[in-house]
Amino acid sequence: MIRVLQTAMAGALNLSSSYSAFKNPSLVSISNPKLFNGVLFKTRLCFSTRISNASIRCFTSNAIDKVRVQNPIVEMDGDEMTRAIWKMIKDKLIFPYLELDVKYFDLGILNRDATDDKVTVESAEATLKYNVAIKCATITPDETRVKEFGLKAMWRSPNGTIRNILNGTVFREPILCSNIPRIVPGWNKPICIGRHAFGDQYRATDAIIKGPGKLKMCQKIGEGPMELDVYDFKGPGVALAMYNVDQSIRAFAESSMAMAFAKKWPLYLSTKNTILKKYDGRFKDIFQEVYEEKWKEQFEEHSIWYEHRLIDDMVAYAVKSDGGYVWACKNYDGDVQSDLLAQGFGSLGMMTSVLLSGDGKTLEAEAAHGTVTRHYRLYQKGQETSTNSIASIFAWTRGLEHRKSVIKCNRLLEELQICISFQYPWLFPNRLSNLTGQNLDGNEKLLDFSHKLEAACIETVESGKMTKDLAILIHGPKVSREFYLNTEEFIDAVAHNLESKLQSPSLV
């Protein structure tokens, strides 16, 4: 069997091109086709003159074939202003161009309350099944929100629930536009910050100590109890016990190194292991083990590296660097430093956020900001808003880009199976009978669409069309109305730019 597979793989180059010709004879005349790199699509219809006064959706449906996305994606709807923006993005930038199988989950606060938050768990489980989720910003209720919506309980953060189920790392990265000034002007390249999304302060147990007494920490283990003296209180105070686990730290290391390698950027881990010698030291040791075992050779081949640094040293380096690296942070450090980076690069509204599993297979993408409540209050009253939708648009593009990668892996297996079937049909008796019904397209074209949508956003801003938050960065807090667009006008401007880009040759 092994020899059969080896022989089939050796002949895969010839057989793949033969299969393409079998499926589509017109491909024979095309020189130098790329093997396993997408398929060729029908020629787009192009008009020599523009069609005026036509809706973008109508125009694109007539002019451009929709890209078929072969496998499902999970969509998690959200709350308030971002929910309104989410619908505009889908209606104007996504559904007119893509044929999607969407597994929809409403994570709006009222539906979470109605389902006792089960919908959040179900959406995370669906993400594990389908490998890609795209999430709208959601409300994490506090006491005020509980009263506002009449909630049954103060439900946990949906992001926290999803992170714990996916057990991954949150990576945030700025979206750069040449005309948007940066508070840290030396940051010429993005900095991708990875936040370990498990344990530490976010799963800690804390307590108020009401009076004098000894605080001890104990664990019941098979070899006998372990007991540690923590502090001898002389009066009232506070105490905290927190933890992490090797499995999650290792997954954090794997996903961080996978992200750095994908970007071909160096990777830095920051801890305070000089103080927390065992706790933070465990992070340092596991990262080094994973690097030595799996990644060192690959990193060195591409002239990138992994390095551990103390958190205070790393913060100082970050401020004076020009960017272009991945920064792996523990949970609390990542929470704080990601907002610092966002502001340093200009705006939290220009920050992507993806949650990547340890094996790199499952990804959840979202905007790094909240639900923009202040704008939503104006929106409810029918007043004009100018809300930045770029991070939400990039949530879609980053999720779709990952969907393409997953499809491509599946496609490689499909192509190999097809090649084997031609020489050894007895291995896959049903394969040849199903060949004419197989649809293996969408890979490179989906990636091209994602890249063009991102480019459309950036070029729209760089052309001077932007929302108020970005206009303030350029013109100051008293910016006049002529310098910015409202929420829907900006999305329309991006859609117009995207329409033009989709008529041009592929970027990939």
What are these regions (language model features)?
Residues 1-44:
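N-terminal chloroplast transit peptides
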Residues 47, 51-64, 508:
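N-terminal mitochondrial targeting presequences
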Residues 65-74, 81-86, 90-117, 124-127:
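N-terminal alpha-helical transmembrane segments of multi-pass membrane transport
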Residues 69-88, 216-311:
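Glycine-rich phosphate/diphosphate-binding loop of Rossmann-like nucleotide-binding domains
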Residues 98-104, 263-271, 295-308, 404-418, ...:
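Flexible, glycine/charged-enriched surface loops at secondary-structure junctions
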Residues 110-226, 238, 332-336:
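N-terminal glycine-rich phosphate/adenylate-binding segment common to multiple enzyme folds
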Residues 197-199, 203-253, 260, 266, ...:
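Glycine-rich phosphate/pyrophosphate-binding loop and the adjoining helix
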Residues 318-452, 456-463:
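Glycine-rich phosphate/nucleotide-binding loop
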